[in-house]
Amino acid sequence: MIFYDFEVFRYDWLVVLADYSNKDFKTIVNNPDQLIEYFNVHKNDIWVGFNNKNYDQYIFKGILTGHNPYKISRHIIANKMPGFSYRDDMKKIYMSNYDVYNTLQHGLKFYEGSMGDSIEESSVSFDIDRKLTPEELKEVEKYCRHDVEETIKIFFKRKDDFIAQLGLIKLTGKPHLMPRTQTQIASQMLNAEALTDTSDEFDVDTPPTLNLSKYSYIKEWYLDSNNMNYEKSLTTKVVGVDHIFGFGGLHGAREKYHHKGKILVMDVASLYPSLMINYNLLSRAVVDPTIYKELRDKRLQYKKEHNNLHLPLKPILNKTYGAMKDRNNTLYDPRNANRVCIYGQLLLLDLIEN
């Protein structure tokens, strides 16, 4: 694995590369030939970075194909354009990129602080309209190396995400999917074809097996057209405890509750995947829903056999629901996503009542 990070200025660029297998750090400054040579030696490795999927890989590919890295950087940052749209010849360069940022929600500096490490910022402005001095380049290199070192730390703190990703690649047999998020890979594995009409978002119903009496008014709340709004919620007492029902899940807890002794914790295993299978609520973008069931059954089989391949299948099964709410994913199906959420809440309520 090669960890890497680019810093790009108008008249200068540099990259810090870390070959983790031998703990070798290398810095290349304004030298495309050196970068080409390094790439040719390591082109079959996995390239790891922080937001490299959206930025660094395109700087890398642009330099390899003779383009100006500063113009590429402006294309991505200032013009807010995707890196792949800069030049077609860059698409010919294949890199197996893994982006640590894929499974995170904050920038690198946030995690540096969270780990108790120093948050280093370079004093060299990216707006400098001249060549950098040797001293400035040295400072930028120090800052860049620090970011690579921090990326390595975060990577190993979250190595299970990487292991799961490798497992998915092994299952699909498609190494080009390495840079994708797990929800994107889920879409690929399920052969999803985007729906052309999703205007039935609030065409919801309730489980046909539902058996409610005391709390039937909660079921009716979901069927009331006045409540077809994500901002709406119902707060009501269930077995004497305030519960909130809505389109984001069921929440209920006793305030400032304290208990000393044994506490029974119960969890519904694979609730959403089970609902999607048993009530036919998988995204309608999936032409053959049996694929999802086969993946679920395969995961249970692997888990029973103590085969680690069950690990990458868990996020695929769980993230399918999230993809059904993502407009940019081919699995997007807000109606069925809403039904899954409603079914789950009402069936848990059924369990409480009965």
Question: Can you name each region flagged by the protein language model?
Answer:
Residues M1-D19, S270-L275:
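Gly/Thr-rich phosphate-binding beta-strand-loop-beta motif of the actin/hexokinase/Hsp70
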Residues S21-N54, I59-I152, F156-N354:
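Conserved acidic
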